[in-house]
Amino acid sequence: MAQEVLKDLNKVRNIGIMAHIDAGKTTTTERILFYTGINRKVGETHDGGATTDWMEQEKERGITITSAAVTCFWDNNQVNIIDTPGHVDFTVEVERSLRVLDGAVAVFDGKEGVEPQSEQVWRQATKYDVPRICFVNKMDKLGADFYFTVGTIEDRLGAKPLVMQLPIGAEDNFDGVIDLLEMKALTWRGVTPIGTEATVEEIPAELADRAAEYREKLLETVAESDEELMEKYFGGEELSIAEIKAAIRKMVVNSEIYPVYCGTAYKNKGVQPLLDAVVDFLPSPLDLGETKGTDVKDPEKVLTRKPSDEEPLSALAFKIAAHPFFGKLTFVRLYSGKVEPGEQVLNSTKNKKERIGKLFQMHANKENPVEVAHAGNIYAFIGLKDTTTGDTLCDANAPIILESMDFPDPVIKVAIEPKTKSDQEKLGVAIQKLAEEDPTFTVELDDESGQTVIGGMGELHLDVLVDRMKREFKVEANIGDPQVAYRETIRKPVESLSYTHKKQTGGSGQFAKVIITIEPYAPAPEELEEGESAIYKFENAVTGGRVPREYIPSVDAGIQDAMQYGFLAGYPLVNVKATLEDGAYHDVDSSEMAFKLAGSQAFKEAVAKAKPVLLEPIMSVEITTPEEYMGEVIGDVNARRGQIASMDDRAGAKIVKAKVPLSQMFGYVGDLRSKTQGRANYSMIFDSYAEVPANVAADVIAERNGTAS
């Protein structure tokens, strides 16, 4: 079959490979690419040869940092795969990939089961309602336990796994799987070179009873999903393979169940059946139906687009990447319509026209040019100047804005100081390009020191960004120590604070009076309306036109400006609700600027009386350690102001879960290594913001304000 973009959307799968770091996502992707004929030589992450790991840093570190998009073909179906990073610092890559995918393969380590980042990625996939199948990988690993891993999918993720295969053997003796649909054994005995096909055999006698038990569970799940099938099954009739597959597919598309497969990608066992499952059970763009968006002129009005070339164009830009020859690549999911090189489209998010230069389907960092981009597929566009992540591209005659993506604020910052004037100029270019690519990378200028401060999701995230500045943009710079992204908030309401802004300097003056109330604001996620933030809410309670309508947004803007610099140490304020209750204006002297200044000053005065406190990021930390080091590990967590949440056993080791302030976690990897002779490891993800204890807060505030003794 010609390796070209398929127009039959029933045969297209847009999938992601997602997991915890080191569960084997990239290796699984490499094997898929080999078996689908894209790679003649298979790449390994440990030798820096993986196709989807194409950045220099990825090759060096053996982890996937950016989501590489790859197109391949299996059994006359087109599979567009996005290999997403498992490291928590790169959660934005996972988030934006899931937004544009139709299905995903969740890869789990057969020894570890569900790990912290697995939970985080699973939650992100649930947020975007992405159907999933599961692959229990590394079945050849010492301590691998398929049944334990399936149990963790149920217990830790609250998901309903549907076991489709059973392992034959484990660890060094893992030889294959039992296919519970066909009730046959698929074996890859001994050392299996890449490309080895499975041998179909009868089920080993010692596993026959267990296979029959799991087959019955599978059939019961299928029967319970459909009345007709239930009557047939419980009436003693045989269900056909086609009926079983159709029922499973329907449940998967509705995210009711999650089929579970197993194997070892590195040893080339179990990959082909996983590919069959992708085609059999994960949805095509047609299964998911219409895409929703809003009217450009009326955000309350919902518009829909069917996945068809005949519909008006609607597409979402989900990633920007720099290309050494073509400049800016914009990765786009086309939901409806079609587009050709040279066409003009509307960026409805920014209300700007864009012209498409070239169109590509990507194979990691290699490009395959296409003449027409069709609905339902993923492409890279060249030539878009103003489009950034989350923007909608559409037909100017039928504008629509698709749901964008929310990205978390950075939790860690470092100061970066260019070594020469030439480096200063190069740094400006580097920052602009990197910020275009990565919405969680922030840049600000410290007013006091004059330094450029960059922010990100963790130490590794910033390490990689700084490394890219040096490598790709030739910036030489000194990097400061990590800084914690503290926040401030208030603990008590302040009612009816009045402030009058008045200035008379000859001619027309400035006059604005506002009366505001501020209060702590912490709504539950389900209480928020679409588009509302938990960080800040503004309410207008003015009656009788005492503040003209056109000045109300200026008061809101003034308050939001003031929130950027808190009362205690100049950190941004969060979780505040402000209500404009009353005010006064002057026909001649009032203006938008006067009301903006009045709102800002009134808010500052109110915050000073509202018991402001400092907040710090708290990390959810999971430490895996041999039992003999438990005392050391727990003592160290307590010394870091951490709180132990739970202690469990897993695969012969102890698991300590704790909540620890980020400020106490810098350099932890080295400390943990030395305390446990290198035998313990840990992972951490951002959990929440919490109030800093008064004695610690006093030191942070003094240091920030330059009054530390």
Curated annotation (Swiss-Prot):
Gene3D superfamilies (UniProt xref): 3.30.230.10, 3.30.70.240, Elongation Factor G (Translational Gtpase), domain 3, P-loop containing nucleotide triphosphate hydrolases, Translation factors
Spell out the InterPro entries in the cross-references: EFG_II, EFG_III, EFG_III/V, EFG_IV, EFG_V, EFG_V-like, EFTu-like_2, G_TR_CS
- GO cellular-component terms in the record? cytoplasm
A Gene Ontology biological process annotation? ribosome disassembly
The record lists GTP as bound by 19-26, 83-87, 137-140
Record domain tr-type G: where: 10-286
Where is the protein localized?
A: Cytoplasm
Q: Mind telling me which Pfam families this protein's record contains?
A: EFG_C, EFG_III, EFG_IV, GTP_EFTU, GTP_EFTU_D2
| Principal subcellular localisation of the protein | cytoplasm
One of the entry's Gene Ontology molecular-function terms is: GTPase activity
Whether Membrane counts among this entry's keywords is no
Which keywords label this protein? Cytoplasm, Elongation factor, GTP-binding, Nucleotide-binding, Protein biosynthesis
Return the HAMAP family for the record.
Answer: EF_G_EF_2_B (MF_00054_B)
The text of the family note is: Belongs to the TRAFAC class translation factor GTPase superfamily. Classic translation factor GTPase family. EF-G/EF-2 subfamily.
Task of the protein:
Catalyzes the GTP-dependent ribosomal translocation step during translation elongation. During this step, the ribosome changes from the pre-translocational (PRE) to the post-translocational (POST) state as the newly formed A-site-bound peptidyl-tRNA and P-site-bound deacylated tRNA move to the P and E sites, respectively. Catalyzes the coordinated movement of the two tRNA molecules, the mRNA and conformational changes in the ribosome.
Name listed for the protein in its UniProt record: Elongation factor G
Q: What is the organism of origin for this protein?
A: Corynebacterium glutamicum (strain R)
Gene that codes for this?
fusA
